[in-house]
Structures are given as C-alpha cells and as structure tokens.
Amino acid sequence: MSRIEATFRALEDQGRKALIPYVTAGFPFADITPALMHGMVEAGADIIELGVPFSDPMADGPVIQRAGEKALGLGIGMSQVFHQVREFRKRNGTTPVVLMGYANPVERYEQIHGQGAQQGAQGAQEAFVRDAAAAGVDGVLVVDYPPEECTAFAASLRARGMDLIFLLAPTSTAERMAQVAQVASGYVYYVSLKGVTGSGALDRSAVEQMLPRIRQHVRIPVGVGFGIRDAATAQAIGKVADAVIIGSRIIELIEDQEHAKVVPVTIDFLRGIRKALDA
C-alpha cells in the first residue's frame, strides 16, 4: 500500500476528507519550500502537491504561470525539486508528496540522467522514477501524459511505491474515465472548471452531478480542485468529494509576501480550510 493509499484509508476511517494544498516549488523564494511544506502539514494538510516549474504550462492560469516563471528564474528545475523533497523528508516521513507538472521536465531529466532518448516519450522513465523515489516522492501527475500511453510509466512508479495520478474534467467522456481507471492509482484529480487553474467560480451542483459518473469507472478517491478559494467552498466540496485541492489561492496569498510572512500566511489560510472541512 502506498503512502497516499494509506492516508486516504486512515481519513476514511476517521470520517474526514483530505486537504491537498498546492505550491510551486521554489516560489516565492528558492529556499522556502521545505519550510512551507512543513507549515502546510502543521495547518492540517494531508497530502502536498508540489508544482514542477515549466516554461509552457498550458493548463495553468496566470497566477500559477507567474509562480513558475519566478521559480525558473531562481534556478528551480527537477533536480532542485528533488532536493527540496529530500529536505522535507528529514523531518517528515509520513505526509505524501505529489509532483505535479508537465512531460518536458520529466523527459529532459530522463535524457540527462537516464536512457530517456531511447525509451520514448511515455516510457518507463527509470532515472526519473528512481530519483523521485529516493527523494521521498509519493505520486506524480504529468498533465500532458495521456493514460493510454502510460502503462510502463505507471508500472515503474508502482514498483517503487508511487502512484500515477490523472486529471479528469467536465468534458471527460466515459471512455476517457475508463482509460484513466486502468492506470491511475492514489487518487484522481477532478478539474471542476473548464479552462485553466484559477479561472472562474466553482459550480457545486455541477460537481455533484459529475462525481457519480466518475465513480462508475474510478474506484480510487476523487479530489476536486480549480476554483476553490475559501473555507465555505471547500466545505461544500468536501461533502461530495474525497479531497479538496487548493492551489491558485495559496499562490495569490504568498506571491507578494516578504520571506518571513510566507509560511504564517499559508498556515493561517489553511487552518481555516481545515476547520471548515472538519466541521
């Protein structure tokens, strides 16, 4: 059983829902990520999604795009992300960490450190998987990897105790859901809005209608993200989903903070979300 699976099982036994905050690695300061991750756990986070900066993030809205651009400017790449996870693991060996990003940084890392050029785009990615596992990563979400081409990658991750997570959207067909169900593990991330991260207001009724359709195909937990900006919305989504995922709002709150305030501001916000989820 992976750490992510164990986390969801424990939460289910407690009658609680998972709080999954997202932050871009190396944002807003290159050295702050491990401390920020610890702050998230202190505030009640159950799983942490750590964004891998990329220069062409097609699914991200302007807020997370800015975060990625700043992190790239600070020299944050995949090797630095692994280092940040290792630093976090020195004090926390239990909270699952999921890397969320795009194919290009994964493949670039593989070409430098492994045999990626020979394996093909969605190969087993052995060097990436090896080093992710060694760093203490628990799951990977690659936005632009199609599930039908990820059998080897998923098997490689699972062999090292990691999960491969996929997105589903309001436009996802039954066929797509079935394809995702074949290879996904850990949880599925349901994108509650059409468009990019941080866009629009979440429609709870639409989410309520979609989740039973997803669960006809997917037997693992379903987390909902995109458009969750406050405790009331998080509480409403927590009543129907297995996890609440919050990213853009956290980035907005910390992007202009001075170094000393980044962690306290994040803790304060997430404590409010946690309290609402547990109410």
UniProtKB/Swiss-Prot annotation:
GO cellular component entries: cytosol
EC identifiers of the protein: 4.2.1.20
Pathway the protein takes part in: Amino-acid biosynthesis; L-tryptophan biosynthesis; L-tryptophan from chorismate: step 5/5
GO MF terms, alphabetically ordered: tryptophan synthase activity
Superkingdom assignment: Bacteria
Catalytic activity reported: (1S,2R)-1-C-(indol-3-yl)glycerol 3-phosphate + L-serine = D-glyceraldehyde 3-phosphate + L-tryptophan + H2O
Keywords: Amino-acid biosynthesis, Aromatic amino acid biosynthesis, Lyase, Tryptophan biosynthesis
CDD domains: Tryptophan_synthase_alpha (cd04724)
Catalytic residues as annotated in Swiss-Prot or TrEMBL: 49, 60
InterPro entries named in the record: Aldolase_TIM, RibuloseP-bd_barrel, Trp_synthase_alpha_AS, Trp_synthase_suA
NCBIfam families cross-referenced by the UniProt entry: trpA
Protein role: The alpha subunit is responsible for the aldol cleavage of indoleglycerol phosphate to indole and glyceraldehyde 3-phosphate.
Oligomer status and interactors: Tetramer of two alpha and two beta chains.
Family: Belongs to the TrpA family.
Protein's recorded name: Tryptophan synthase alpha chain
Organism listed in the record: Verminephrobacter eiseniae (strain EF01-2)
